[in-house]
């Protein structure tokens, strides 16, 4: 698979059909979306674009470390690569924040939005978050990447061999590549979009699926519920045994809900 580049953004495109754009979370990269979703055979009839956000994965940093500048970069990418075609957008956490901005900006093009644990309030001092917890499986023997196991426990609810392997596959590559200085400046200075209060203004026909974790200590779930419950086109799912790394805690449910959205969005 050949890695492509446009205007400093590294991306991978696969397949043909209606397009799905995948946006990963902060400090992560396209491994967290591509490796996860490519295991789902039901997306084979869609064209998929997995990209690295600026300063993450293989994408270059940008001069201005702000969400407004990153969004502007994504708009230029979409206008050039996707054009005026209809598309679906997926976003996790910070990628979910940007996905909402994209759905707002391209109201006549975005047919569906799938959000997992999305940021809806950039200022973490204003978020209502939850207390994290762990649900332990069988005793584990850690033989690789033991320095990251504490982060794994801090971010995942389900603690077992399967979820630990998934964490190393989906999360670790991004953590190791992320430009810490760039992201630090982004978080400190200009993490919020200037039009944050307008993010929930999607197209009237845009289908929405939001999936939240009950033990999400990063973005919580209560404010997302309050925001999206007002939308007639939105389905909201709250998972009890899940935290912020929801795709690792409950992969089967994520696949099921994602497939339901992309296959039934026109009904």
Region locations from a protein language model:
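Flexible "cap/lid" loop of the alpha/beta hydrolase fold
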Residues: 100, 104, 113-143
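Conserved alpha/beta-hydrolase catalytic His-Asp/Glu region
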Residues: 124-126, 144-202
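Gly/Ala-rich beta-loop-alpha elbow adjacent to hydrolase catalytic centers
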Residues: 91-95, 99
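Catalytic active-site module of serine/aspartate enzymes centered on a nucleophile-bearing elbow/loop
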Residues: 234-267
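Residue in the alpha/beta-hydrolase core beta-strand immediately N-terminal to the catalytic nucleophile
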Residues: 87-88, 111-114
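Active-site loop/oxyanion-hole signature of alpha/beta-hydrolase fold enzymes
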Residues: 49-90
